[in-house]
């Protein structure tokens, strides 16, 4: 009698094929952002924020963002964010355009949300439609994280 051992079928590696093929195909894509579901970097999650109006989306998918930035639902619209930087520590940036849009930014030195005039284009994500949204994202988040 043969010794008691687990006899694996001859086709043991073929069972992995359905899992390996999609992985190989996604790995070979020239633009890695096209395989969005594979990557671990995730967008920040915020509690429901009450917005007076929905902002124009800067992006719809990660591949529409430059470099390593990710397309995230942030404040009141979708924006390209660099997940390695703290948005609330960015300086005030009105951008090069000449619109007159009252906005709010978080000043890390004073720990306050301060009103400024946004030009309507470019700038950075430390730019909120209201003081309430700025407070919700930058001040309340910091209070919660200081407890951890």
UniProtKB/Swiss-Prot annotation:
Top-level lineage group: Eukaryota
Q: Mind telling me which InterPro entries this protein's record contains?
A: Elafin-like_sf, Kunitz_BPTI, Kunitz_BPTI_sf, Prtase_inh_Kunz-CS, Serpin_venom_toxin, WAP_dom
**Which residue positions does the secretion signal occupy?**
1-35
- Domain called WAP: residue spans: 37-84
* Entry GO CC: extracellular region
> Per the database record, which ranges form the BPTI/Kunitz inhibitor domain?
88-138
Q: Per its UniProt record, what SMART domains does this chain match?
A: KU
> Which Pfam family, just one, is annotated for this protein?
WAP
Subcellular compartments: Secreted
Q: Name one GO molecular function term.
A: serine-type endopeptidase inhibitor activity
Q: What is this protein called?
A: WAP four-disulfide core domain protein 6B
């Amino acid at each position: 009698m043969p010794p008691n051992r687990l006899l694996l079928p001859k086709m043991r590696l073929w069972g992995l094929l359905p899992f390996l093929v999609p992985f190989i195909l996604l790995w070979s894509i020239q633009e890695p952002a096209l395989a969005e579901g594979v990557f671990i970097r995730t967008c920040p999650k915020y509690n429901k924020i009450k917005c007076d109006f929905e902002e124009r989306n800067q992006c719809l998918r990660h591949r529409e963002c430059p470099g390593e930035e990710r397309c995230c639902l942030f404040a009141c619209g979708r924006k390209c964010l660099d997940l390695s930087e703290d948005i609330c520590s960015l300086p005030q940036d009105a951008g090069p355009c000449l619109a007159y849009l009252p906005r709010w930014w978080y000043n890390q030195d004073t720990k306050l949300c301060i009103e400024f005039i946004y030009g309507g284009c470019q700038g950075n994500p430390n730019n909120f439609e209201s003081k309430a949204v700025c407070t919700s994202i930058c001040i309340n988040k910091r209070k919660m994280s200081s407890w951890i």
